Curated annotation (Swiss-Prot):
InterPro entries: Glyco_trans_1, GS/SS, Starch_synth_cat_dom
Pathway listed: Glycan biosynthesis; glycogen biosynthesis
Gene, per the UniProt record: glgA
Keywords: Glycogen biosynthesis, Glycosyltransferase, Transferase
Pfam families in alphabetical order: Glyco_transf_5, Glycos_transf_1
GO BP terms: glycogen biosynthetic process
Role according to the record: Synthesizes alpha-1,4-glucan chains using ADP-glucose.
Family classification: Belongs to the glycosyltransferase 1 family. Bacterial/plant glycogen synthase subfamily.
Domain of life: Bacteria
Name this polypeptide is given: Glycogen synthase
Catalytic activity as recorded in UniProt: [(1->4)-alpha-D-glucosyl](n) + ADP-alpha-D-glucose = [(1->4)-alpha-D-glucosyl](n+1) + ADP + H(+)
GO cellular component entries: cytosol
Record carries keyword Plastid: no
Species for this entry: Rhizobium tropici
Length: 480
């Protein structure tokens, strides 16, 4: 089976978040199931710099008013189709924002162009290769099924994955003519959304199947609390909505072989983690003692619950814990966490930028990782924690709820607990979880058992890929 995957970012070429990890890992995980994937991605400067010896596959002289070329290249085991369109993607900032952190004003055109290019490939314009199915990801490629619906193309099934429904790609109605869609596409059944153009909304309406990245999130987005205004549209498609938990690359996140950590180890040699712990202590300027180190590796945003973390930081220190925080985001939240570090020197350390090697070292050296998200479609950080023996302390929501077994009495008795869940997502809720963690940490036998149980968890892409392959086969066999 041939699948075209379309995404605005893919690891290892370009990454701003978990979307890139998922879209990069899935094609490799699907290979054993006979799925051949080509992944279409914008030709950002970082992408163009990273690829070697690309082959020109298709010229698009008028892609929404600009010239573009589709290049093909193999990189890190993935077959990439790179949309080389300098007018859209050759920018000095990031994939979505300029150097000052503001959205590019033409983001609607940049990602409509990506979607239209995907629809052109779906229609068979790429010489010698035509997909059996198209898989789009988030709002940036959600117009792929829209263009497939409204342009006269051969009928192909399409899948749209909602990685985070909070990001919807909503723009003023004045951009509609620039999309070059027929007039009737601007309707309730199409991309019209309360008088605006809704990229994600249009994709939800037109894709043949919808997936989210965990079963709990699939249920949550049917409710007003989590549906972000789109719960009605999703409910109308609920019969074709599937929650499939993400996996992680178990080779990259393998503490026995990880080149990014100071000392490798396994579930049988957990004492070796002490060397990694010492490096974390040095890097974050923490005091060296026997108390637990709680880490945070996250965007510093309200969604991720970082305001709650800032509120409880002093109390965690007074309990005897230490905090190592890695990430950047909202300026006010960054300021609050840096202020906590200033008040509690040696007990709270903050590094205000993401650093992939450091994130590996933190998971390999810290005792637990705090993930107090208000909503979390799937989450990957807790899976990295399981793999590394860094116990996740998570809000009971979305994929966090699906992947972590809470250390309640029954789970501890059965020796199946892998972390701590808490609700509600408030400062007091998090504090109660931290108190439980401090109590459990005192019994090193129980703590070690939980570490080993987490490290045994199957967090690879195996079962998830099997479910995606089954969904693909079902859609292709019944036709669009």
């Amino acid at each position: 089976m041939k699948v075209l995957s379309v995404s605005s970012e893919v690891f290892p070429l370009i990454k701003t978040g978990g979307l890139a990890d998922v879209v990069g890992a899935l094609p490799i995980a699907l290979k054993p199931y006979g799925v051949e994937t080509k992944t279409l991605i914008p030709g950002y400067p970082a992408v163009m710099k990273a690829i070697r010896d690309p082959v020109v596959r298709l010229e698009l002289p008028d892609l929404l008013g600009e010239a573009a070329t589709i290049l093909e290249v193999e990189h890190a085991g993935i077959s990439f189709l790179v949309l080389d369109a300098p007018a859209y993607y050759s920018r000095t900032g990031g994939p979505y924002v300029d150097a000052t952190g503001k959205d590019y004003p033409d983001n609607w055109r940049r990602f409509a162009a990506l979607s239209l290019a995907g629809a052109e490939i779906a229609a068979g314009l790429l010489p010698g290769w035509r997909p059996d199915l198209v898989h789009a990801h988030d709002w940036q490629s959600a117009l792929v099924p829209v263009y497939m619906r409204y342009y006269p193309t051969p009928e192909l099934p399409s899948v749209l994955t909602i990685h985070n429904i909070a990001f919807q790609g909503q723009f003023g109605a004045d951009i509609f003519p620039g999309l070059r869609l027929p007039a009737h596409a601007f309707s309730v059944e199409g991309i019209e959304y309360y008088g605006d153009v809704g990229f994600l909304k249009g994709g939800l309406q037109t894709a043949h199947a919808l997936t989210t990245v965990s079963p709990s999130y699939a249920e949550e987005i049917l409710t007003p609390e989590f549906g972000m205004g789109l719960e009605g549209v999703i409910a109308s498609k609920a019969y074709n909505l599937y929650g499939i938990v993400n996996g992680i690359d178990a080779d990259i996140w393998n503490p026995a072989t990880d080149p990014m950590i100071a000392q490798t180890y396994s579930a049988a040699t957990l004492k070796e983690r002490a060397i990694n712990r010492h490096r974390v202590v040095e890097h974050f300027g923490l005091e060296e003692d026997d108390g637990p180190i709680f880490c945070v590796v996250s965007r510093l945003t309200w969604q991720k619950g970082m305001d709650i973390l800032a509120e409880v930081a002093s109390e965690v220190v007074h309990m005897g814990g230490k905090l190592a925080i890695l990430g950047a985001g909202d300026a006010a939240l960054e300021g609050a966490l840096f202020a906590a570090a200033g008040r509690h020197r040696g007990r709270v350390g903050v590094v205000g930028r993401h650093n992939e090697p450091m994130s590996h070292l933190m998971q390999a050296g810290c005792d637990a990782i705090i993930i107090p998200s208000r909503f979390e479609p799937c989450g990957l950080t807790q899976l990295y924690g399981l793999r590394s023996g860094c116990l996740p302390i998570v809000a009971r929501t979305g994929g966090l709820n699906d992947t972590i077994i809470d250390a309640n009495h029954a789970a501890l008795q059965a020796k199946v607990a892998t972390g701590i869940q808490f609700s509600p997502v408030t400062a007091e809720g998090l504090l109660q979880a931290m108190r439980r963690a401090m109590h459990l940490f005192q019994d090193r036998k129980v703590w070690t058992q939980m570490q080993k149980q987490g490290m045994k968890s199957d967090v690879s892409w195996g079962r998830s890929a099997e479910r995606y392959a089954a969904l693909y086969s079902s859609l292709v066999s019944r036709g669009a």
